[in-house]
């Protein structure tokens, strides 16, 4: 998965750590692309708005889902107030929803932010349902 490249393409602060949990043998290209875009947007937000020093990206592969967690140590924000007008957050939510997934945001002022995108995996060609 290209998350390492995404993390390395973000110059300067914050420090980005990428973790993988599970096996990504057959991740469909449309899901990988959506997760990469969500990760890019989350990293951009952490850099521009959160003044984060550290961000941890974790991709977790389960038999029926793949999840991306992006956690930063930035200034945090009121997720309820920003959610309706934040274009980047709306874009991330739309990418997850387009693939039947969800995007959840947990943040409070002064507490950093945690973003979770969970997308269901569809059986590939020749795979038993």
What annotation goes with each model-predicted range?
Residues 1-129:
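Coiled-coil dimerization/phosphotransfer module
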């Amino acid at each position: 998965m290209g998350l390492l490249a995404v993390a390395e393409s973000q110059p300067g602060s914050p420090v980005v750590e990428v973790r993988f949990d599970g096996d990504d043998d057959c991740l469909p290209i449309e899901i990988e692309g959506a997760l990469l875009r969500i990760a890019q947007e989350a990293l951009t937000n952490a850099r521009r708005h959160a003044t984060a020093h550290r961000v941890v990206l974790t991709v977790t592969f389960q038999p029926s889902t793949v999840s991306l967690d992006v956690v930063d140590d930035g200034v945090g924000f009121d997720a309820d107030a920003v959610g309706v007008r934040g274009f980047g957050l709306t874009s991330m939510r739309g990418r997850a929803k387009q693939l039947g997934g969800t995007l959840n945001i947990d943040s409070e002022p002064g507490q950093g932010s945690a973003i979770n995108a969970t997308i269901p995996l569809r059986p590939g060609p020749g795979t038993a349902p």
